[in-house]
Amino acid sequence: MNDELKLKNNLKEVRTEKKLSQTQLAETIGVSRNTISSIETGQFNPTAKLALILCIALDKKFEELFYF
């Protein structure tokens, strides 16, 4: 049995609410569009630093973007 917690997110919903493309958000925070896509689909969990950068860029609290 796998007891590892999987971090989930509302990144796509928040990003589209702010009318940003994956490319625009990626360029704003200095990562690739593929990184944004991978986070949105749950293929990649961001580091604490990247999660904080996303929160700042999108003007959201951590718990508004990420949950378990």
Question: How would you label these PLM feature ranges?
Answer:
Residues 1, 67-68:
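Short, charged recognition helix plus adjacent turn
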Residues 1-17:
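A short, Lys/Arg-rich alpha-helix, primarily the initiator
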Residues 16, 27, 56:
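Alpha-helical residues within the helix-turn-helix
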Residues 19, 30, 41-42, 59:
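Central "turn" residue of the DNA-binding helix-turn-helix
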Residues 20-35:
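Short alpha-helical DNA-recognition segment
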Residues 49-64:
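DNA major-groove recognition helix of helix-turn-helix/homeodomain DNA-binding modules
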